[in-house]
UniProtKB/Swiss-Prot annotation:
The lineage of its organism: Eukaryota, Metazoa, Chordata, Craniata, Vertebrata. It is a multi-pass membrane protein. This is E3 ubiquitin-protein ligase MARCHF2. Its EC number is 2.3.2.27. GO terms for cellular component: cytoplasmic vesicle; endoplasmic reticulum; endoplasmic reticulum membrane; endosome membrane; Golgi membrane; lysosomal membrane; plasma membrane. Coiled coil: none annotated. The RING-CH-type zinc finger domain is required for E3 ligase activity.
């Protein structure tokens, strides 16, 4: 970058007359990052002010359209182009796409509607027991489990006592009391079985819905598709760099 002989600081007033001309040059810094240099000079060529702005290199690289990050160097996870989208929307991380397909419960691109080759695996029951979903479903599951653990032994003991009392009444020829205790036992077990079946069916429906919408998705990419993705990523990088160079010039 060339400097003039004007001793004024940038931003200060100058007694030089004439219209100011604008010239732009490009320099290479020590860290090899492009810098955008704007020089404001007077009509006689003396430098009035200089504005230097380093250009970021992130825009020159393809990024993931989901997380908006570039290639993950730490995990060695590159960018893929598994669908027909082009430009900045054509590259994506495999892990990001798998999480998106799992959360959205779809198997195609929402932009170009390309069907992905995926493998779905249901999550285990223990994971649903730890996190069944919304707060009201958690509370319902917890209450039903506590009631089941409390009512089951209580119903068993009550039924055994009623049957034992009915047997004693039959032994002493008190048939009316015996029939009443037997009817009470049948009613008790009927209510217990109906409540258990209704609660079990309700939670089975919740688990089936959770299992259907919360699956582990694994993206299957053929080798030919992977090679095409690499070429597409390299081509996108070259095009973006070429566009950036033309913009700077």
């Amino acid at each position: 970058m060339t400097t003039g002989e004007c001793c004024h600081l940038p931003g200060s007033l100058c007694d030089c007359t004439g219209n100011a001309a604008l010239s732009k040059t490009v320099e290479e810094a020590d860290n090899r990052r492009a810098q955008y240099v704007t020089q404001v000079t007077a009509k006689d060529g003396r430098l009035l002010s200089t504005v230097i702005k380093a250009l970021g290199t992130q825009s020159d690289r393809p990024i993931c359209r989901i997380c908006h990050e570039g290639q993950d160097v730490c995990n060695s996870e590159g960018l893929l182009s598994p669908c027909d989208c082009t430009g900045t929307l054509g590259t994506v991380h495999k892990s990001c796409l798998e999480k998106w397909l799992s959360s959205s419960n779809t198997s195609y691109c929402e932009l170009c509607h390309t069907e992905f080759t995926i493998e779905r695996r249901p999550r285990p029951l223990t994971e649903w027991l730890r996190d069944p979903g919304p707060r009201n479903e958690k509370r319902t599951l917890f209450c039903d489990m506590v009631c089941f653990l409390f009512i089951t032994p209580l119903a068993a003991i009550s039924g055994w006592l009623c049957l034992r009392g009915a047997q004693d009444h039959l032994h002493f020829n008190s048939r009316l009391e015996a029939v009443g205790l037997i009817a009470l036992t049948i009613a008790l077990f009927t209510i217990y079985v109906l409540w258990t079946l209704v609660s079990f069916r309700y939670h089975c429906q919740l688990y089936s819905e959770w299992r259907r919408t919360n699956q582990k998705v694994r993206l299957l990419i053929p080798d030919t598709k992977g090679a095409h993705s690499t070429q597409h990523s390299l081509l996108s990088t070259k095009l973006l760099k070429k566009t950036a160079d033309e913009t700077i010039v």
